[in-house]
Amino acid sequence: GDVYKKQLYNIVDSIYVSRLGTDALTAVSLAYPLQNAILSAAVGIGVGISSAISIHLGAGNREKADRAATLGIALTLIHCIFFIIAGLTISEPFLKLFTDNPKILNDASIYTEIVLCLSFGSLFQIAFEKIFQGIGEMKITMYLLIAGCVVNIILDPILIFGLLGFPALGVAGAAIATVIGQISALLLYIIVYRRNSYAVHISFKHLVFDKAIIRQIYSVGIPSTVMMLLPSILISVLNSILTAFSDVYVAVLGVYFKLQTFIYMPANGIVQGMRPIIGYNYGAGESSRVKSTIRYSLLTAAGLMLTGTILALALPKQILALFDADAALMSAGVTALR
């Protein structure tokens, strides 16, 4: 859900930003790898937190489940500090590797710095989402995912184009709308958590340095993070190649990857959703349920991927029209989607 939401944020940003011109769309595309790095770390470690919680709950050890949730929040704070420092130090030098166009560089730098320096909303929101998933509260995560997306969709045109008396902030407005959507979802998670009683409790009394649980979180989280980072590395390499030809190709690549990931994300969501179920049943020794969950999840994911492939092949022009594509963007984009 968190990954799907992030891709929806990116696509909505790109649809509105494309109205500002190809340079603005290129700027958001160049910012994507760094933005995805935040997501990769948050989701990867979040998966580790969720896995640890579900395993300990399945084994009937509530105390360790509480400790895993609390340590997960503490580790998220450390990651948040790291990304703020990164946003202030490496974002502009990184972006200079891919463009010397001053307008594109300025817009990309502003967008990236806002998203990285205010990344606490995304990081903590995803941590809470994974904690809720770890205890099986899938409906709540879905509702709050939708709430954050709605806030972003409403604010994007207002802040980008300056509606309802707000100043027109352009690309910066897209970034601000994104982080406000993330922070809104985080605040809703905190409110829901504090007003209800759940299977795990986050508290300072559970904040104990437990090497085994930390190792458990990172042993699952780091491989997941690395796997999710690979597309960012690929996109960065391709951006460096394509900028030698035309900034339009960078914009096309950005649109293509966001659409590709958006199509892929429902299948990924199925896989993410099966993890706490598998973890709980594995901890309870229910091997037959583990096998049936894996089988059903993989079949459903394959069906979703097939549907996405058919849409991309059949309706590429209609999809690209959402991004206000000019002739050059449309021509290259249709080829990329197909």
Annotate the PLM regions.
Residues 3-4:
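Short, small-residue-biased leader/transition segments that mark boundaries at the very start
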Residues 29-32, 76, 112-115, 119, ...:
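Residue-level recognition of transmembrane alpha-helices
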Residues 8-26, 95-102, 158-169, 229-262, ...:
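Helix-terminus/linker motif at the lipid-water interface of multi-pass membrane proteins
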Residues 175-178, 190-231:
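Interhelical loop/hinge segments that connect adjacent transmembrane helices in multipass membrane
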Residues 139, 150-187, 316, 322, ...:
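Membrane-interface helix-loop junctions in multi-pass transport and translocation proteins
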Residues 25-85, 122-141, 239, 252-316:
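Small-residue-rich hydrophobic transmembrane alpha-helices
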Residues 82-113, 307-334:
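Short membrane-interface helical motifs at transmembrane helix boundaries
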Residues 102-128, 259-261, 267, 327-338:
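Alpha-helical transmembrane segments of multi-pass membrane proteins
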